[in-house]
Amino acid sequence: MRKLILAALLAGTGLAGHAQPAADYPARPIKFVLISAAGSGGDTLARLLAEKMGPLLKGNFVIENRPGGGGSIAVDATAKAPPDGYTITLGGATTHVLLPASRPSLPYNAVKDFAYIGQVGTASIVLLASNDLPANNLTELLALANASPEGLQYASWGNGSTGHFCGALIQLKKQAKTTHIPYKSVAQIQTDLLGGHIKLGWVDMVSGTPMVKSGRVKAIATCPERSPSLPGVNSIQDEGIDLGGRSMGSWGLYAPAGTPKPIVDKLAAALRSTLDMPEVKARMMELGTQAAFIPGDEYSVMTAKDIEYWKQIAKDANIRNE
């Protein structure tokens, strides 16, 4: 009898232990692992979310920048962290759709290894050109590339990145004579563009918009859609490149798989409330990102479908990211 009573007490304690973390959460700072370097577009967006979500959660965040591998280093570290709600990451199309579609050896499963907190928003990227390149839009660029014996080279922030896929789509759909050059970061692309070492490079809107508006470079096209940051610049879809209704420009929040649902729900509620704030919407618009919350369960299903679509594009465009 005493053993039965003890077992019941232990079971009760266990149940209380599962219920208590959500009520007390967060009891310590939450580690926010970022896929990009300090000062980048993703870093700026993450710090904005942390600033606004912290008070809603009655807690705070500790930022940890872990750039590299197209974002896979930070995302993999999050997937392998304890599923207790104290490690999250800001990823999206590159880390959870395009890398899984092009890298068979990716160390994480983009769907199964994460608890999806929710979509943060959608964003485009921009193809920048040096001012001395004799092309001002995608039509002129394609004519220039195809008239050159060697074609043209363009940079992106890594094999399998959004920039790589956007460039590959142009090459595939428009039979463009172009060659991809993988860089380690957007910052390096900016430096080499301004230094005259390369003529073309894809960057995020946060990084690219000031460069265009200051006249230091010009914008050739955005991908996948027009951006509110540069509304006068055509998107690749404006130029007749169909994406089949699939996403390739989203940001999302993720925790490790197995994170208790009450904690995920608490994070999701804070995220949703943050994205409803007018000042957050306005600041995100300045960053070239449109706030657009989608619940984690729905976002996960969308991601799984998008991966399959982009796998075929990767195969057709011969994108392999080992």
Task: State what each model feature region is.
Residues 53, 77-86, 101-188, 236-241, ...:
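Hinge/capping helix and adjacent helix->loop/strand transition within the periplasmic-binding protein
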Residues 19-113, 151, 159, 174-200, ...:
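N-terminal (or domain-start) structured segment
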Residues 94-105, 169-173, 200-234, 311:
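A ligand-binding cleft/hinge motif common to bilobed small-molecule-binding domains
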Residues 27-29, 172, 213, 238, ...:
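An extracytoplasmic/periplasmic, membrane-proximal ligand-sensing/linker region
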Residues 1-27, 139, 322:
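Short, low-complexity disordered leader/linker segments with a strong preference
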